Amino acid sequence: MSKHKHEWTESVANSGPASILSYCASSILMTVTNKFVVNLDNFNMNFVMLFVQSLVCTVTLCILRIVGVANFRSLNRTDVKNWFPISLLLVLMIYTSLKSLQYLAVPIYTIFKNLTIILIAYGEVLFFGGKVTSMELTSFIMMVLSSVVATWGDQQAIAIKASSLEDLDQELVESTIFVLNPGYLWMFTNCISSALFVLIMRKRIRLTNFKDYDTMFYNNVLALPLLLVFSFIMEDWSTKNLSVNLSADSLAAMVISGLMSVGISYCSGWCVRVTSSTTYSMVGALNKLPIALAGLVFFDAPKNFLSFFSIFLGFLSGLLYAVAKQKKIQQQKVLAATLEK
């Protein structure tokens, strides 16, 4: 009985679909919790929130280790030296994402964020070998196209609202914003740091033979000093601002979001380990679709043909990518069987 239970546990632990579903569920929960925290009145200390999340995650892991549920490597100089660049990239990725959203509209942000998928796909070719099939590339293009269509829908809604301002030269304003808006520079940095984070983490996992809990522990514990330093440099630590941001409600919400981060930290490392970094990134992009649908239903988001069509394109690109991956796996199995003969 225990043997069958052990085999079943091992099967789930190495299951791609199980890791993807768990990652999707945990990331949706994490998104909802984070949205609640940052929407608190006058909340402006994002790095403190991320610090609390990492701290709660680290403490939770230590407790799980004491009770015998989790097992991970203790901190040592070699692993810290090897993993520190990944933690630095993680902090850079989070910060540039926040700065991009500060200057860019969400649809524009999504367009450039989805370009990261293509960067990762070709980065995998350089790091790990293999190739990107034409079907995979088509799915990537469709994903970006869905974001472009969403932007058109958003701009269409804005144009209708601003139709009364007939004397305003919209093309001149938009072209000026594109040239002067620093959000595009932040977004470019975010795409590069996001791709490097996923690719280097996967390579380090292979080289160090890190397990899921090892990845989870090192990602969080090494991020703690970085997040605190970034917070001291970039955020307002005045007594007045601290009293607003560190109220009982905000602290409770941050602790809850930290517990949610335990799930997303574990599932992120699990998904990268048993699938691929491109699959992990693609799943992350597709995971925005339920939130997009919720935005159409519950929030003040554009509700027009282009908005719904962009969501349809997003799901279609996900299906195409899944088919492309299955075909590639089948071809690899056939090739391996041929070589064995």
Curated annotation (Swiss-Prot):
SUPFAM superfamilies: Multidrug resistance efflux transporter EmrE. Keywords: Cytoplasmic vesicle, Endoplasmic reticulum, Glycoprotein, Golgi apparatus, Membrane, Sugar transport, Transmembrane, Transmembrane helix, Transport. The keyword Ribonucleoprotein does not apply. The chain crosses the membrane at residues 12-32, 47-67, 86-106, 108-128, 140-160, 177-197, 215-235, 252-272, 279-299, 304-324. It is found in: Golgi apparatus membrane; Cytoplasmic vesicle membrane; Endoplasmic reticulum membrane. Residues 33-46, 107, 161-176, 236-251, 300-303 are lumenal. It is a multi-pass membrane protein. GO terms for cellular component: cytoplasmic vesicle membrane; endoplasmic reticulum membrane; Golgi membrane. Its main location: Golgi. InterPro entries: TPT_transporter. Residues 1-11, 68-85, 129-139, 198-214, 273-278, 325-341 are cytoplasmic. Glycans are attached at N241, N245. Belongs to the TPT transporter family. SLC35D subfamily. Involved in the import of GDP-mannose from the cytoplasm into the Golgi lumen. This is Probable GDP-mannose transporter 2. It comes from Saccharomyces cerevisiae (strain Lalvin EC1118 / Prise de mousse). The gene is HVG1.
